[in-house]
């Protein structure tokens, strides 16, 4: 597994805030000690309190609000708001600018993101993974409480992959663009980290406790299944992606019927090949070939 030197959304970047968002109140000259002798103590205290107040931002209506969130939190809000504009603007800085405006911020807030489109895609993938983890954790607790029966491993993994891929449906037409961004060299470390963490969560909640080579094998196989199913989904025109889910069920069943280590090794190699072939299909999608109809 590749190790990120700067994990996305885990290590805040150098904090800065666009000057376009700053209020004119912060541009006042520093408090002059000489002026205190000419004014009342009450007036001097009022000026002091104004200088000690936290930073303020100006919205599009010209109204000010105090800043009680970090830059990272502000970025998360903007990126989340931008997702609703992806169907119209794609995974782009334009979608981020629209997201900022929907929060009554200046479109200049988009300048907070060095690589807008890629950061938006990675934010979406991160949020989807978090939603999946919450879903799996909730199901796990129900089993522990005895209010729900534990699913067979094959069914659990199938449902987990299906639930995760369904999160792409609102952006299915724009997903080839997203995959292209995730495959960019600068984004591959973050993409692999998110993918491996997601697959590991699936196996963890499925009850996998292996510590030998099968730990790596099982995750490699599931990664191949996830990637290949994701690409089938892009080409699927059946109602509610029925063909995609049939493909997924068949791949999971095949993985569960592996009987010995030799078959496991072969399947691991096949998973790697599937991943490479998937990348090629994705590039075709991005150039307008084999588009989903």
From Swiss-Prot:
GO molecular function: isoprenoid binding; lipid binding; protein homodimerization activity
Domain of life: Eukaryota
Record: residues binding a 1,2-diacylglycero-3-phosphoethanolamine: 219
Compartment annotation: Mitochondrion
Region (Disordered): 21-73
Pathway involvement of the protein, from the record: Cofactor biosynthesis; ubiquinone biosynthesis
Keyword Mitochondrion assigned: yes
Pfam families: COQ9, COQ9_N
Residue spans of biased composition, Polar residues class: 29-38
Chief location category: mitochondrion
Bias kind Acidic residues: ranges: 61-72
GO cellular component: mitochondrial inner membrane
PANTHER family per record: UBIQUINONE BIOSYNTHESIS PROTEIN COQ9, MITOCHONDRIAL
Subunit structure: Homodimer. Heterodimer; two heterodimers of COQ7:COQ9 come together on the same side of the lipid pseudo-bilayer and form a curved tetramer with a hydrophobic surface suitable for membrane interaction. These two tetramers assemble into a soluble octamer with a pseudo-bilayer of lipids captured within. Interacts with COQ7; this interaction allows ubiquinone (CoQ) isoprene intermediates presentation to COQ7 and facilitates the COQ7-mediated hydroxylase step.
Protein name: Ubiquinone biosynthesis protein COQ9-B, mitochondrial
Organism classification: Eukaryota, Metazoa, Chordata, Craniata, Vertebrata
Gene field: coq9-b
């Amino acid at each position: 597994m590749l190790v990120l030197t700067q994990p996305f959304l885990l290590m805040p970047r150098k904090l800065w805030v666009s000057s376009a968002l700053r209020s004119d109140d912060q541009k006042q000259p520093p408090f002059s000690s000489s002026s205190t002798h000419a004014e009342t103590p009450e007036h001097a205290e009022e000026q002091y309190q104004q200088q000690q107040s936290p930073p303020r931002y100006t919205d599009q209506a010209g109204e000010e609000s105090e800043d009680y969130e970090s830059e990272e939190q502000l970025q998360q809000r903007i990126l989340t708001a931008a997702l609703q504009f992806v169907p119209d603007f794609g995974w782009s800085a334009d979608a981020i600018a629209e997201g900022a405006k929907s929060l009554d911020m200046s479109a200049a807030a988009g300048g907070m993101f060095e690589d807008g489109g890629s950061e938006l895609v990675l934010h979406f993938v991160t949020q989807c993974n978090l939603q999946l983890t919450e879903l799996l954790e909730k199901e796990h607790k129900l089993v522990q409480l005895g209010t729900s029966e534990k699913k067979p491993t094959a069914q659990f993994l199938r449902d987990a992959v299906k639930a995760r891929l369904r999160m792409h449906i609102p952006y299915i037409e724009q997903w080839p663009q997203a995959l292209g961004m995730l495959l960019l060299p600068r984004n591959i470390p973050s993409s692999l980290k998110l993918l491996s963490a997601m697959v590991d969560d699936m196996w963890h909640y499925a009850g996998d406790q292996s510590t030998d080579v099968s730990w790596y094998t099982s995750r490699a196989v599931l990664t191949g299944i996830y990637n290949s199913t994701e690409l089938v989904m892009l080409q699927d025109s059946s109602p509610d992606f029925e063909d995609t889910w049939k493909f997924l069920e068949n791949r999971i069943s095949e993985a569960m019927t592996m009987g010995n280590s030799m078959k496991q090794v072969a399947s691991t190699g096949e998973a790697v090949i599937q991943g490479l072939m998937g990348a090629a299909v994705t590039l075709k999608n991005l150039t307008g070939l084999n588009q989903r109809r």
